[in-house]
Amino acid sequence: MTPLQQLAATIEARKGADPASSWTAKLLSKGPEKCAEKFGEEAVEAIIEAVKGDRDALTSEAADALYHLLVMCAARDVSLSDIEAELESRHGTSGLTEKANR
């Protein structure tokens, strides 16, 4: 299991947990909108570090953004497997072609 798969499994396991026992459970208990807001904040922080060129800070913020992306998706019952399947369906297709077909 990759670290991303492990993270997704942990997030999934926390969906029914007591919000007092887990940051993930607490975030999920606040609903999809709050999860989306938090993802947006973390994405902006990653963008800032990318612009600044701080590799270590970008790596850290990217990890935070990935975590919050998975939490946001879990809040809407979209799993990492769902995302991987979507990516697999796009494999071998030019990005320009894929975008034109939307």
Swiss-Prot record:
SUPFAM superfamilies found in the cross-reference section: all-alpha NTP pyrophosphatases (SSF101386)
GO biological process assignments: L-histidine biosynthetic process
Subcellular location(s) per record: Cytoplasm
GO cellular component: cytoplasm
EC class of the enzyme, as a word: hydrolase
Pathway of action: Amino-acid biosynthesis; L-histidine biosynthesis; L-histidine from 5-phospho-alpha-D-ribose 1-diphosphate: step 2/9
Keywords: Amino-acid biosynthesis, ATP-binding, Cytoplasm, Histidine biosynthesis, Hydrolase, Nucleotide-binding
InterPro entries: HisE, PRib-ATP_PPHydrolase-like
EC identifiers of the protein: 3.6.1.31
Nucleus keyword on record: no
Coiled coil: none
PANTHER family xref list: HISTIDINE BIOSYNTHESIS BIFUNCTIONAL PROTEIN, HISTIDINE BIOSYNTHESIS BIFUNCTIONAL PROTEIN HISIE
Protein name, per record: Phosphoribosyl-ATP pyrophosphatase
